[in-house]
From Swiss-Prot:
GO function term, MF aspect, one: sequence-specific DNA binding
Name of encoding gene: trpR
Reported function: This protein is an aporepressor. When complexed with L-tryptophan it binds the operator region of the trp operon (5'-ACTAGT-'3') and prevents the initiation of transcription. The complex also regulates trp repressor biosynthesis by binding to its regulatory region.
Protein name as it appears in the record: Trp operon repressor
Pfam families: Trp_repressor
Organism listed in the record: Pectobacterium atrosepticum (strain SCRI 1043 / ATCC BAA-672)
Feature: DNA-binding region: 68-91
Amino acid sequence: MTPLSLIDPALSEQDNEHWLRFVALLQQSIAEDLQLPLLQLLLTPDERTALGTRVRIVQELMRGEMSQRELKSELGAGIATITRGSNSLKAAPPALKIWLEAQLLSADKP
């Protein structure tokens, strides 16, 4: 498997450092079962809702049963958000797509 790059080309060097610090903090919070209070501290209710919507967008795009316009109506998301999700999914590493499929498309997942 090809190692994933830790550097996000969309971010500046300093922003990458901040992002990686957040990821490390989140990983540590998961190890200590503190991820929910951490995310509630760092994210507003609207940001948490937006993340949930983005997960649903990725899930439905992977399922492939609805058009982007149908997703817009179903989820109340903007077409630009759905298009970004679609483009990001196309560019995602194959290993991530396989993992997401197992997480989001298995019959027993909510």
